[in-house]
Each structure stands twice: as structure tokens, then as C-alpha cells.
Amino acid sequence: MTKALYDRDGAAIGNLQKLRFFPLAISGGRGARLIEENGRELIDLSGAWGAASLGYGHPAIVAAVSAAAANPAGATILSASNAPAVTLAERLLASFPGEGTHKIWFGHSGSDANEAAYRAIVKATGRSGVIAFAGAYHGCTVGSMAFSGHSVQADAAKADGLILLPYPDPYRPYRNDPTGDAILTLLTEKLAAVPAGSIGAAFIEPIQSDGGLIVPPDGFLRKFADICRAHGILVVCDEVKVGLARSGRLHCFEHEGFVPDILVLGKGLGGGLPLSAVIAPAEILDCASAFAMQTLHGNPISAAAGLAVLETIDRDDLPAMAERKGRLLRDGLSELAKRHPLIGDIRGRGLACGMELVCDRQSREPARAETAKLIYRAYQLGLVVYYVGMNGNVLEFTPPLTITETDIHKALDLLDRAFSELSAVSNEEIAQFAGW
């Protein structure tokens, strides 16, 4: 008898790159559904952490990748230009409303894109200091971990001159100030305490994803950017997970009425293939040659997939679709909250939604163990959803933008049942899955 796929995975692939919550073993997928090796279908409310922006087996991506693979324009942009990468760069530049001349840097992931943005800023400006937020997960390379503030990376070496601020969380407000102004006051105080001209970059997520799917108070990002720019600090918007139509707008920063100096994209840009991008002023990305490169950067097959994603977003008006379906999902989650007291807060924009679980709605004590059991039971019932947050108690919903309303309703029914059957999962069953 053939050994089960998950067992083979355990024997052959190292744990360094695993973030597992239950024994999911995938043999295929279609639309917003994953297929296990026994043929069981599961509704995917994670979308591979947002990477499967168009779902699985989308015809536009299949056609684009097949054509690019059949007649590949090389394999990289390092030492030769290739049409898919150049065309994708032009398309991305046309989508960005920033003033002045901008260029593109291509990478494989949000991790290398955020690191490249930071390194380029330091090289171009001579300023190595950086502002970021507690709870922020900007990547898993040495460079991107240096200015990440997530608790899982607490032991990583941090950048010299790092200023780490609380992220504005209306559900758990810093100094009991839901407006976030107390954080801006803290920022002003910290900037006054460091040498002028020492801070080069400020990284912020317009929705903090891995920190708990937190939507900041209206106007916070604009006020934050104004303070930074008054000190000559470039504002970098990390939209790796929440950008490109997911929030209900093409770019998530559009909700906030400001335009960042630099935009970082990834995950959904490749529609499931490794692809990321930095959009930045030309003087930043032209500051040096051969300074931030890897051999397969600008790969034409990945770039072709990226073009297919952007064309589908435009043709099918996926921002409007994400807004409508996200509202449907959050309305359904709100109905669940009426029946399940574990649910403390529901938040999000478009198809980037979060549901925070608490032991008690008054004390808001994080329900970490219950969260792990809930998603495990949901998996057993046929639903894929993961948790995020500094306390591991926020369910994150980032399904394919193409998910059907039928699948949303079905997923809500399964989640409702999982809440009711939480006791069916033992501590022993979840103990082997570290999660976050």
C-alpha cells in the first residue's frame, strides 16, 4: 500500500519551512476548493495565505503559463530583457498613482521584496534607521526580519535604529485611544529623540495581516505618512497580502486617502506562482547596479502569470467583486457571533477579513487553544482556514477573489458547525501542530 502523502511529506521535507495547523495533504484544486489525495474536497478560505488570488486552475493563468512555458523568453531579467517582465512592469507602473518617475524591482516573495526595498533605501539615502510596527510580519529573510515586529520573530536580529510602534488596533487600543493619535504622539516623541536624518524608511501595512487582520482607524495612515514625510522619511506600504483587489480597491492604501512613496506587492500577484514587486521612485531603484538580485528574478513564466492576474482583475472588476463578497462573508460571521460567545470581534475590508476569538467578551482574554481546536475541527468538516495574530486567536479569511457566493454560504455553515463541535477535538490532536 502506498504511504500517505502527509507521511511522505514528514519523512522527506524539513520542518524549517512548515507552518502547519492540521494534516492537510493536497493533490489538486479547482476554483476555491482544494482536493486531498482521497478525493475529498475542502473549501479554501485562506487562498494559500492569499497567494491563490484567482483560485486554483483559473483558465487565464493556465493559458498564460502554458504559452510562456512553451516558448520561454529566457529565465531571468538579470542579464537580458524579456517581454513578459517588461510588460508586467509597465502594467504595474500604470496602476500606481504616485507622482514622479517610478520603476519596478521584481522578486520571488514578499520577504525578498521588503528586504530589497529597505536595502535600496539605505543605499540611496544613507539612512539606516527604520520605523515599523509591533505585529508586523514583513518576511522571513534576515533583512526583512530585521524590521518585522511579530512575536514569532522576537529572537531575530533587528536593524540598528529600529523604532517599533504599536499598531493601531480599535479592538485593543493603545492607551485606550481608538483613534490611534496616541501612537502618533509616541512616534513624534521617538523621532525627537534620535539624530535628525537618521531614519530612512517607515514600513506599514494598510491592514496588518499576520498581526491579527487589524484595520486601522480612518485617517491614521495619512497622518502617519505626514509625520514621516516631514522628517524626510520614505513611507513603504506593504500590501503583499492585502493588495491587488483584495480589499475592495485595486490598492489597499486607496481606502486611506494617501499614496505611499513605495509599494510592495507579492502573494496574489503571481496567482500561485512565486512573484513579488516593488514600485519605487527611480532614484531609489537605480541607486546601484547588481545590488539586489537573484538568478530567477523577473522569470518570464511567473511574469506571464502576473499579467494574467492583472488583466483578470481589470476585466472582471475583482475589486468590486471582493467588496461585495467580503460584505457577505462578514455579515455571515456577524450572524455566527450571535450564537457563539467565543467570537469577540469581526473586522476587515473586502475579502481580507478577521475574526478574533476571546474567552470572555468583557475581559477580551485571547482564546488561543480554542482557536487551534476550531480550525482543526473546521478542517475535519471540509474547510481550510488558518489563524494569525500575536496571541494566535484571530481567524484570517483571505479566500480566492473568485470564490462563489455558494461556497461562502457553505463555508459559513461548516464554520458554524465547527463552533458547535469544538469539544470533539482533543488537546493531543492539536499538540503536534505548532501553528504560529
Swiss-Prot record:
In which residues is pyridoxal 5'-phosphate bound? G110, S111, Y137, D238, E239, V240, K241, T295
Sequence positions bearing N6-(pyridoxal phosphate)lysine: K267
Stored Pfam families: Aminotran_3
Listed cofactors: pyridoxal 5'-phosphate
Q: Does the keyword Isomerase apply?
A: yes
**Family of the protein in this entry:** Belongs to the class-III pyridoxal-phosphate-dependent aminotransferase family.
Protein name per the record:
2-aminohexano-6-lactam racemase
